[in-house]
């Protein structure tokens, strides 16, 4: 889909026809849909809505009022909000993902190409604080333009190379910056790679839940 959106939007709609019908009876307060996670590559602002429109129509056939979130180009980063347009649907909500500074949150992450950020980046500098001021200003600008508060669908820091205390500090800083703007925040992930919960011992990682 990301490499050739036009060739795959019918397949995407067919998948959502099945998924939406299967979950149609689930309460909306417990289940929202996201048509496609983190559009990137050739899946961008120029074709985003046209690509998603058939899938959204398929969802609405069985879930007429189900909340649906849509993220923008370039992995739905915060800067994608500036060019994100939404369909005319009162139950569609904008989302963005927040992993800034990427050099901290993804240090040593082997799936990052051409190479992952170097190890040893520490969070909490004056530059990091200024980054939050700059990025929350982007949210205010989006709300001023659209009247809608976006949903932070992902945030977190890779646990393999970042001490837990630093992950707690980062998580708290992001929450304290964005939550006062009314931004709902979803942490990635529950138990893997960027975890909040230790499934092996059956408990929350110290400090993460409170952050």
Label every model-predicted segment.
Residues 12, 85-88, 111-113, 169-171, ...:
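Short, hinge-like loop/turn segments at secondary-structure boundaries
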């Amino acid at each position: 889909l990301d490499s050739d959106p036009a060739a795959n939007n019918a397949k995407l709609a067919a998948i959502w026809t099945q998924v939406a019908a299967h979950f149609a009876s689930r309460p909306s307060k417990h289940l929202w849909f996201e048509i496609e996670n983190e559009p990137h590559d050739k899946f961008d602002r120029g074709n985003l809505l046209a690509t998603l429109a058939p899938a959204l129509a398929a969802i609405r056939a069985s879930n007429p009022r189900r909340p649906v979130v849509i993220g923008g180009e370039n992995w739905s980063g915060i800067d994608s909000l500036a060019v994100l347009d939404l369909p005319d649907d009162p139950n569609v909500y904008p989302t963005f993902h927040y992993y800034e500074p990427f050099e901290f949150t993804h240090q040593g992450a082997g799936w990052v190409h051409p190479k992952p950020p170097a190890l040893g980046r520490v969070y909490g500098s004056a530059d990091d604080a200024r980054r939050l001021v700059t990025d929350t200003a982007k949210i205010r600008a989006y709300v001023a333009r659209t009247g809608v508060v976006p949903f932070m669908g992902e945030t977190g820091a890779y646990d393999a190379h970042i001490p837990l205390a630093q992950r707690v500090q980062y998580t708290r800083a992001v929450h304290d910056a964005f939550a006062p703007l009314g931004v709902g925040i979803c942490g990635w992930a529950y138990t893997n790679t960027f975890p909040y919960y230790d499934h092996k011992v059956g408990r929350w990682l110290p400090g993460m839940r409170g952050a």
